Amino acid sequence: NSELLADNWHTNPISNFSLNQLRTRQMNAYNGEAGGLWNDGYRAINMANIVLYHLPEHQEQNIEKAILLEGECLFIRAICHFEILRMFSQAAGFTNDNSHLGIPIRISIGSATEEQNTPRASVEQVYNQIIDDLEKSILLLPENKNERVSKWAAMAYLCKVYFQKNDFQNALYWCDAIIESNQFSLNTNIDEIYSLSGWNYSNESIFQMINIPQDMSNGTPVSYTHLTLPT
């Protein structure tokens, strides 16, 4: 949905009513796309918090797997807060100190009532939590590039977070860290960016989801094909 706000998608005002509301920043409380982002995002955050809460009880069984799970859960919690924040709050810089309202921060398990009553934190507080989770995940995630999240993905998201926060010095720092790692290179054939899929990774890919044919069943990939513009 953040791609809509960046004008990387076309929307049809008639057939893509909910998406068009997001693109023009005229959505209401009944917008299904926005509601889905909020509900699914916080559902993922809650699942990550549950794993993090119970992880100490089982980490002795397999310490390496426990470290990996902790890193992955911190990464998921961070990027979900980040994407929700970008959709439901004013951007960083709206106030000089980013004290304007952001979204609720959820980093622990609570009852449904407690979660519903969680107040909105400031944008600065949300960004600080996101950055803290990502920095911790970098220390826990592996360097290998496969279908699971790696430290490079956490670094790449830190680039995006700092850039969105208008902290360009730190954004540049993490961009340089990825570039200087020599783990990634630009594709010589630009068509490979769109033609390579599944286990056949693009050299440029830092973090991607692995899809199987059954993932086409909900029609979402078709929608992306029609809506996304190359940038």
Stretch-by-stretch model annotation:
Residues 101, 150, 157, 202-205:
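Residues that flank catalytic or metal-binding motifs in active/ligand-binding sites
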Residues 1-4:
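Acidic, glycine-rich segments characteristic of secretory precursors and extracytoplasmic regions
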Residues 87-128:
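Short coil/linker segments at helix-helix boundaries
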Residues 14-88, 121, 136-142:
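Conserved, well-structured interaction surfaces
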Residues 172-229:
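Hydrophobic-face positions in mid-chain alpha helices that act as interaction patches
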